[in-house]
A protein has these predicted regions:
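Active-site-adjacent loop/helix surface patches within enzyme catalytic domains
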Residues: 2-109
Length: 110
């Protein structure tokens, strides 16, 4: 299994299970509830006390971060069943509250 060639930043999180126990069959997209860079998101996920992660993150400028290798299960959706089957992606918001909009650049990177 390989990771995306779109990755521009890597900060691997300890918050994962290796290896995932199901083949990838879906994508789960979640918004960050903030306008974080891929580096800032990676710093959050590297903390073991956070107990959260995602395979990838996309910031408002379209940069892509890798936090959990695709061969491993991230802790993204609070559902082990889902996370074992999904590539999980956190996407930065370019405005806070309301509709939690994401930038066109980030959306198109998806």
């Amino acid at each position: 299994m390989s990771n995306s060639n779109l990755v521009t930043y890597t900060n691997l999180s300890p918050n994962m299970n290796a290896p995932r126990n199901q083949p990838i069959s879906k994508i789960t997209i979640h918004h960050m509830a903030g306008n974080l860079t891929v580096e800032q998101c990676g710093e959050l996920f590297v903390s073991a006390s956070r107990e959260a992660s995602a395979n990838y993150g996309i910031d408002s400028n379209g940069n892509v971060g890798l936090y959990v290798d695709e061969a491993n299960r991230s802790w993204a959706s609070a559902s082990p069943w889902n996370d074992n089957r999904a590539v999980t992606i956190e996407v930065a918001n370019d405005e806070i509250g309301g509709g939690w909009h994401v930038s066109d650049v980030a959306f198109n990177k998806l």
